[in-house]
Amino acid sequence: MAERSAPVGVMDSGVGGLSVLAEIQRLLPNETLLYVADCGHVPYGEKSPDYIRQRCRHIAGFFHEQGAKAMVLACNTATVAAVADLRELYPTWPLVGMEPAVKPAAAATRSGVVGVLATTGTLQSAKFAALLDRFANDVQVITQPCPGLVELIETGDLTSPVLRQMLWGYVQPLLAAGCDTLILGCTHYPFLRPLLAGMVPADVAVIDTGAAVARQLQRLLGANDLLAEGPAGDARFWTSADPEILRKILPVLWHKCGDVQSFAL
């Protein structure tokens, strides 16, 4: 039985999961968080499911060695490829994954047209198709794969003209099709909200699932009597790329500095 004071492992293909990490820390400030950014293998969205499962198994094993009491797959593509596999490997481990916010978007739309920005891997998955079948029968869903977007966000420069131009190229067709609700189907994309605010009308809802994932983690930890009790927890970081790169990006995306260690390939 894990201790309440044990850490929670959070992983992503890169820095996108920091958007989820922030929501977890906001809701559960007493938790100690371990974050692995698999930047040496980013992006996951264009890689095979088998490759992604291998990476997720490797990282889950690391969290297990660190004594983590729960794990969050803060990556839509990793969830699609690996969550079932990891639940089979670790059946007693509280495990939270991501999925595009199809249900709340379908409820929120007024025009009946919902746009989805996501990676190719997420959009082509059976899990995403099942979400549409379950929650989006009464709305039109227009999907937009966004190759290249994750790589630009990984640089930490969220105001570059190249990023702005690429994002507009993906968003403009959705707006032209009448979308009044946009789903951010990748954990990297919430960092683009300031850019999106200048591109989409004020009455277009932009939805992601970071806060919902934090609430689900809270429910699972509570159900297993694993919620940490003061003092405030901290966050520690690992990366499969150059640690110095993540150290420079953390103040931009995490709004704090952090200790970053190398994660063995």
Swiss-Prot record:
* Organism, scientific name: Pseudomonas putida (strain GB-1)
One Gene Ontology term of the biological-process aspect is: peptidoglycan biosynthetic process
> Which Pfam families does this one have?
Asp_Glu_race (PF01177)
Signal peptide positions (record): none
Active site per database record = C75 (proton donor/acceptor), C186 (proton donor/acceptor)
Known pathway = Cell wall biogenesis; peptidoglycan biosynthesis
EC number(s) given by UniProt: 5.1.1.3
What is the official name of this protein in its record?
A: Glutamate racemase
GO molecular function annotations of the record? glutamate racemase activity
The positions annotated for binding substrate are D12, S13, Y44, G45, N76, T77, T187, H188
Q: What is the gene name?
A: murI
Instruction: Identify the keywords attached in UniProt to this record, alphabetized.
Output: Cell shape, Cell wall biogenesis/degradation, Isomerase, Peptidoglycan synthesis
Protein function: Provides the (R)-glutamate required for cell wall biosynthesis.
Q: Which PANTHER family match?
A: GLUTAMATE RACEMASE
Homology family: Belongs to the aspartate/glutamate racemases family.
Q: Which InterPro entries match?
A: Asp/Glu/hydantoin_racemase, Asp/Glu_race, Asp/Glu_racemase_AS_1, Asp/Glu_racemase_AS_2, Glu_race
Q: Does the keyword Mitochondrion apply?
A: no
The domain of life for this entry's organism is: Bacteria
Q: Does the keyword Isomerase apply?
A: yes
Q: What catalytic activity does the UniProt entry give for this protein?
A: L-glutamate = D-glutamate
